[in-house]
Curated annotation (Swiss-Prot):
Subcellular location: Cytoplasm, Cytoskeleton, Microtubule organizing center, Centrosome
One cellular-component annotation, GO: centrosome
Originating gene: SASS6
Protein name: Spindle assembly abnormal protein 6 homolog
Assembly and binders: Nine homodimers form a cartwheel structure with an internal diameter of 23 nM and radial spokes connecting to the microtubule triplets.
An example Gene Ontology biological process: centriole replication
Function statement: Central scaffolding component of the centrioles ensuring their 9-fold symmetry. Required for centrosome biogenesis and duplication: required both for mother-centriole-dependent centriole duplication and deuterosome-dependent centriole amplification in multiciliated cells.
UniProt entry tagged with the keyword Cell cycle: yes
Amino acid sequence: MAAELLFNCEVCVQVRSQACEERRLNVRVNVELLSISNPVHKKDLAVRLTDDADPFFLYNLVISEEDFQSLKSQQGLLVDFSAFPQKFIDLLQQCIQEQNKDIPRFLLQLVYSGSVLDHTPVSLNVVETNPFKHLTHLSLKFLPGNDAEIKKFLARCLKCLKEDKMTLEDKLRKTEEDFTRQLSYTQQSLSEKSRELDKLKNEWTSYTAALTSKHTQELTAEKERALQAQTQYQQQHEQQKKELESLHQRSIQQLQNRLSELEVINKDLTERRYKGDSTVRELKAKLSGVEDECQRAKQEVVSLRRENTTLDAECHEKEKFINQLQTRVAVLEQEIKDKDQLVIRTKEVLDATQEQKVILEENTEKKQSHIEKLETTIKSLSAELLKANEIIKKLQEDLKTLMSKLKLKNTVTIQQEKLLAEKEERLQKEQRELQETGQSLRMKEQEVCKLQEQLETTIQKLEESKQLLKTNENVITWLNKQLNEVQMLKRMETPSSMHGGIRTALSPHGMLERPSFPSSGISHTISPFYAFQKFAEPAHNKNPSPHCPVPKIQFNSQVSKIDQHSDVQVVTAATGHPANKENGDNLGLESKYFKKKEDSIPLRGLSQNTLNSENLKPYLPKVQPSLPAAVTTTSAYFPG
């Protein structure tokens, strides 16, 4: 005989009886299909009603094909025996779906014909409710289980409980082994990560201290240089103004003297009148040229002032950039502190899990001892039950012969029933305790899963912090490189091709003087422009050590023709870098930091057309082939 389980679930049932009021009861409905092959192949439908809280609640129903035909004719069913089990299960599922509602559409009713204690047949009705009428779709009669069936049912329940207990013990052992391995591995990884964090902290503190000291020194040096350059520019502008005014006054006096001489000559010599007028016109043209030169000199003063303002703005931008870097360093220190706190929290959580593990082990030992005691009690109960069965058989045999001793035997049976009831209560308590231990084990498994997730998150955060530290180190190295490039300015080379009365010399602060013209009284200087830009280092400059770079400046001067405008440009080459930094990589920064500024104004020289060529001839140098100038590039701040 083979049994196929079709349905096994708890259903809320409405219990009706004549002796007591209506009440609701959770009943487990078990539907099985029994196939019998000896001597004829048959299929029977077995339905069993049980209560998990009451082990003596047992009602059975076995429907064969012949019984179903009579049931079909009595209740007017339209389904064959092969489709009846599925339809019955569908009705039960509809009852389960509707049982939590206030007014369910489908109900299961368990109706007792007599009292509950009489062990009379019970009818199970599937009822559909509507506002007009209650319709019974199906009504099945169940027989109460006898002592043998109840004993079989109890033995089956005990067997299932033992199997569940064995599986739970195996799971406990496996989980304990897994947890011990995982805890040992996590402890090792945590110790390694804590060591790495300590090393990183020490390196970071030393590195930040060195950086702050370097940056402060460099800032003070740059500020002093900017102030010195500003004072020098102001002094030079004042000197140029005074010289131009004196030259203008001298030229005016000379012209007035010549005019007076020409008037005397006109009075004396009327024949040379036209020549005097021509000389007067020439002198007027010279006056206009001198005035144009004065206006151009004023324009140069205005352009120099603008350049001073641009340099001040660049200094302010660099100070802002340094402040931003200091704020970034503070943010990174705060992130490191937060990660330290996270590590401390994870350590606390691990300690708590270890304590919980110890408590769980103690509880499991207690439960195992308690289960062993329960097994001994169950064995004693089974032995007592066997003895009780033997006594009952003997009493049944003696009933036929000894009617006079019925009262005494009845008292003995009552006492035995009391003992059985007490034993059954103990069994129920033990079943409840087993359920509670299973629930506690599930809770502990969930807690362990949560702890594993927390450990994984902490490991991910540690990896992210390492990546952040690497990016910060790259940013700091780039900043050091930029600040070193700003510090290193190259010296200016004096041109060797100048001749005669033209003076070309560097002032103590890097100023280049223009040639002075004593006949006209004009003498002014050229102010250099420092461009902070990287160039490729020549091969012969790679020998100095990277720790002590020597600044070098390239200057290319050319003397143009007298009738053309001359532009003076000073180009500064980049300082020598260490061998490993010649390529000038950007270290992950954006390209906006390397863009050129195109709003600067170049320095233009005074026009030489306005000067008298006859006065300048003895002071002009002979054009010589100049030395090959170094390769110059346009400045990022002063192009063109």
